[in-house]
Amino acid sequence: MNCNEAIEYIHSLEKFGMRPGLERIGELCRALGEPQKGLKIIHVAGTNGKGSTSTIISCILQKAGFNTGLFISPYVSNFRERIQYNGGMIAPEELADCVSAVKNAVENDLAPRGIQPTEFEAITAAAFVYFKRKGCDYAVLEVGLGGRFDSTNIIDAPCVGVLTSISLDHMAVLGDTVEKIAFEKCGIIKPGSEIVAYPFQDEKAFAVIRKACAEAGDRLTVPDIGKISVISESLYGTEAEYDGLRFELHLAGKHMVYNACTAIEAVRALHADISDAAIAEGIAAAVMPARLELISREPVILLDGGHNEGCAEAVADFIGRHVAGRRIVMLSSLMADKDVDGYLRRVAPFAAEFIATRADVPRAMDAEALKEAAAEYCADCRAISSPAEALEYARSRVKNGEALIVCGSFYLAGEIRDQMLDHNN
């Protein structure tokens, strides 16, 4: 099996759908020799900020000298982004080897017993195999969906459990209230862990978190809002201070400062040999594609893959403080199963011109339908179904001193980012 065959095998499991539960991943891990056992894990759940918080934690641990694994989703441009070691993507041959081990376990052990893992379960198991083989000092695991029944939750009690911002999303699976969603996220809270929570949490979510920690007998740490100060912020980065520790952050948006403070408390909760210098260096090293990513400075081109109301609020806040003085062209694709109006009413009013397109995935909303929805908030809307053609048109409509904002979907962000980088090269 080569790398492409490994990825094809993983994607072939998509037909088995998304089926929450720990039975299948448990059987798969047992067939693989329990590779998740013995790993020192930082487990990160939440609605928004999971990927960035996980990445910052991973970068800090690396700067402190620890060999660190990182498991995140979704990927933007390359499938191998999902499994990383010391800041680098898993090598193609290593992905092939780990997925081959998973495939053999499925075909020789699970399938004969009528057990069929899902796509996410298979890639989670491959990550466990990889981290075990690499001898990671720590592994940072981002939850895929929810927490309680997510395949990453097959682990024993993590060293630290982290809960990022919790809000309404994936309501068909997780529940239709913040309390129900928080309950699912709090499934990662287990006796014997340190728990850290994002500071600006919905109070209803906080109540659920506090209750879960009390029941598990775990200490809950929340960054002290009074010790957070943003010193300077621009399109190009942020300088901030938390609890006497000054740091530079290249992930855009004030919410990223709060994610960084959450990460600081998470690594402190490990009680490991991690200096303030390593923390500052790790935060400065953290980068993530398609999170208010600045692709071009002039004209400004920003790329954001967030898709729910919380993400829309972060994008709107950033636009309002750093881009609103420019004429803005917005290029967007949204998934039909998301709260489309909730997203659009926050971001579309900033657009002088709104271009609706359709990312190349079945769940994507039709471009014409998105255009009609956006017309409630922007007077100048058009639909161009092809993302490549939409990008070409959008770029023709933006000149120096103006801004193009691509937003609403990681699928679109991946397509556009690849096109932009190819164009720039």
Residue ranges of predicted features:
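N-terminal leader/targeting and accessory segments in enzymes
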Residues: 1-48, 52-67, 76-78, 194-211
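Hydrophobic alpha-helical packing residues
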Residues: 57-62, 131, 374, 420
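Beta-strand->loop->alpha-helix junctions that form or flank phosphate-binding loops
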Residues: 72, 197-200, 212-234, 249-254, ...
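Acidic, Mg2+-coordinating active-site environments of NTP-dependent enzymes
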Residues: 110-112, 122, 134-142, 158-250, ...
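Nucleotide phosphate-binding/pyrophosphate-handling subdomain across enzymes
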Residues: 38, 133-134, 138-141, 149-162, ...
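Active-site-proximal loop/hinge segments that shape catalytic or ion-binding/gating pockets
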Residues: 409
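C-terminal helical cap/extension that packs against the catalytic core
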Residues: 200-221, 236, 268, 300-301, ...
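ATP-dependent carboxylate-amine ligase catalytic core
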Residues: 22, 29, 34-37, 63-156, ...
